[in-house]
Amino acid sequence: MIMDNFDSPFLYNRPEITVDSLKKSIVYKLIFSIGRSPKEASQRDWLNATLYAVRDFVTEGWITTARQSRSEETRRVYYLSMEFLIGRTLSNAMLAEGVYDVAKQALSELNVNLEDVLEKEVDPGLGNGGLGRLAACFMDSIATLALPGVGYGIRYEYGMFKQEIEDGHQVEKPDAWLDKGAAWEFIRPSKRHTVRFGGGIHFEGKKCIWTSKEEVEALAYDQMIPGYANDSAATLRLWSAYAGDRFDLADFNKGDYFAAVQDRTLSKNISRVLYPDDSTWSGRELRLRQEYFLVSASLQDIIYRHKRIHNTMENFADKVAIHLNDTHPALAIPELMVILIDQEGYEWKKAWDITRRVFSYTCHTLMSEALETWPVEMMAHILPRHLQMIFEINDYFLEYVRTYVSTDAEFIRRVSLIEEGDHRKVRMGWLSVVGSNKVNGVAAIHSELMVTSTFADFARIYPERFTNVTNGITPRRWIGVANPELSALFDRYIGKEWRRDLSQLTLLKDKVQDPELKKSIAQIKYNNKVKLANYIKNELGVEVDPNALFDVQVKRIHEYKRQILNVLHIIARYNAMLENPEKDWVPRVFILAGKAASAYYAAKQTINLINDVANIINHDERLQGRLKVVFIPNYSVSLAELIIPAADISEQISLAGTEASGTSNMKFALNGALTIGTLDGANVEILDNVGQDHIFIFGNTVEQVESLRRHGYRPFDYYQNDEELRKVVDQIISGRFSPTDANRYHQLLQSLQYHDYYQAFADFRSYVDMQQNVDAKYQDQNAWIDSTLQNIVNMSYFSSDRTILEYAEKIWKIKPVK
């Protein structure tokens, strides 16, 4: 074989997709890359050998894609995100390359079970929640659509944390995901960039000079993201922090060994963990350093790539699109300005014109308190030149506002990039809007509320800047990998093209009354529930009945996501079952999972309460096993792949107007779970697609939520007036579920009784009543399977391929390279 993508040809042997060839390749990698003989190899050795062998199939297409993206005519997007929750790589790569069955047979002939090997792969600790998983789905779609795009993130050494549950409490342990090696990645020793911090600035005439105090080296590691069946792959470049050559030999020779390596250790802290505890000033400082580290290394890399191809910055905005996934990378805006002015010698207005044409920004929240702000004092200490640039951008922007929009002092105060007060702050959401050419929301209702509430003032200034691109998920991961039986069913009924074109699911609409299809769907769901039930028994020691309704809420633990509302209903159901033991109750298993931020007390209390309630309910023999509660620790992509296909009910119960979109709602529905949810985020569009008979909508609307707030929401009134709610709350407060510590949940419940910012009490009655409708439908299994099928066949809109094509056309202005 000749690699013809270079000026002169190089001969090499391309791996063949045959059992014999792959078997030889795996053994070769085992011996010569890992240094193990087949007789001595552990399952993890076989995993890494298989990863190396499968990686060979992807690499050629990856190199070819990168070369085509470097064409002078190509415009390329660079996707900056603090998180990429990519999940396990081997199973996804084997399916993308069409070698899953071949690999399974090859390993079998080597007396190795592929499923056992796959279980040894750890999830990369590169993200936490929906933000990171969305970024991963997007990279998968960019690769499958052969779009010229590169992802940039941080290679966290210990992820966020490994969650363990001890006596019901969340305990955070290091997530040492790199300890066993990362066979899928390529280290790039030549791709190093220096990131500067601290020091001070001074002016020489009009020129601002930044004299930094500290330097950190960013070293690149590349992950390949394979496209599905297209011999293409995208690059995810992750930065790891090093101190470079800052080893103090003088200190070492004097015997001060700790001082000799102190700077190196401090530098590496930048890429140690995702989202360090921000309850302290030093923790906040580290977060700010992380964000700038990502931005600085990535922009240096982008500019280096661009200059290598074009040898000029004049066409930078024509050839480069940089996308900010939330506000975390917003420092890229002043960073590019600093580079263009201080290093490239551009005039301020020209630099600003280039900058605004380059950037676009996705807003992932409706809550203004969730939009990042940084203390001016902190930024002055860590990034003095960038703070000065933000002041300059703000002056320029406010002058524009005064000239063309309004001179009203209150309006000017609201839109200023600097929040005034005793402690001045930089508003990163505001900076992202002002410095971008497009700003998008991630669901129809979110985008509408974004321009009428969160960014209403900016929508007045830049009405053409705001748009909507509803989120999506990759069917290759969330059906292909997660639900192989459902994949096989789709293949049998509509062919295999649905993996690249999810609209093919509409072909099933004519078959939804087919008795064989209904029977198969029910059997697949049952089989997935058995798998999950076995996991729960083996890992947690809790026996659950796969014939019961599996009611699932798995997501980051946060007050706005309202896991507490779920718990209130569980206790209410428990009480009702004890009061009416003869009633024909639908057996239910409530399954919850998710991590709470280490400094988020209320969220950690909620996890504790879930586990305390589970402990009481699961040991109450009066229930005869008809009600179980399970909290599954350390939620991850691989656990999601196990849990989601097994769900009957998907809990999407955030307060209306707080969830930007959500994507777990899409994953559950595509796998045949019915949604119980509020009119929030993408739930609204799921309702539009599946129809009101196939989803359970409850709770106040956005307008009703706002009306309650305006007129003075009094949660204690709901507590007093609803006997069922009052009993539940009183039980928790009295220590019914925490007999060893009766006061454990006083603070949590008093916060609900007297504040309840996310209005759990207001929606309680509607929620509990709707759960009765869930029971009624589940008792009619024919109607339930009808609704399951209607959810599946109407989910094609929620493919991340559709989402990315919209980004490519509306925002990034890029085209496929193949």
Swiss-Prot record:
PROSITE patterns in UniProt: PHOSPHORYLASE
Gene Ontology annotations for the cellular component aspect, listed alphabetically: cytoplasm
EC number: 2.4.1.1
Requisite cofactors: pyridoxal 5'-phosphate
Coiled coil, from the record: none
Annotated gene: glgP
Membrane-spanning parts: none
Record key words, sorted: Allosteric enzyme, Carbohydrate metabolism, Glycogen metabolism, Glycosyltransferase, Pyridoxal phosphate, Transferase
Residues bearing the modification N6-(pyridoxal phosphate)lysine: K667
Known catalytic reactions: [(1->4)-alpha-D-glucosyl](n) + phosphate = [(1->4)-alpha-D-glucosyl](n-1) + alpha-D-glucose 1-phosphate
Record protein name field: Glycogen phosphorylase
Disulfides per UniProt: none
Gene3D superfamilies (alphabetical): Glycogen Phosphorylase B
